[in-house]
Amino acid sequence: MLIPYDQLQAETLTRLIEDFVTRDGTDNGDDTPLETRVLRVRQALAKGQAFILFDLESQQCQLLAKHDVPRELLE
């Protein structure tokens, strides 16, 4: 299930994005400040280039690039 980013509380969205950008393997040696990485993800969400996917089975949220979202969820 896709969750519209603009329907999340601001603090919840920020924590979700911060969790994503600080996970092992997501920085690739990039020394970009946390605030900049968070802003980039917010912009990707606003432009429809990224989406929040909630998995009912695991009860977990994921941030995915548009090309990684199952096609049937985008229709």
From Swiss-Prot:
Signal peptide: none
One Pfam family linked to the record: UPF0270
UniProt lineage: Bacteria, Pseudomonadati, Pseudomonadota, Gammaproteobacteria, Pseudomonadales
InterPro entries given in the database record: UPF0270 (IPR010648), YehU-like_sf (IPR036685)
Gene3D superfamilies hit by this protein: YehU-like
UniProt organism field: Pseudomonas putida (strain ATCC 47054 / DSM 6125 / CFBP 8728 / NCIMB 11950 / KT2440)
Protein known as: UPF0270 protein PP_1747
Family recorded in the similarity comment: Belongs to the UPF0270 family.
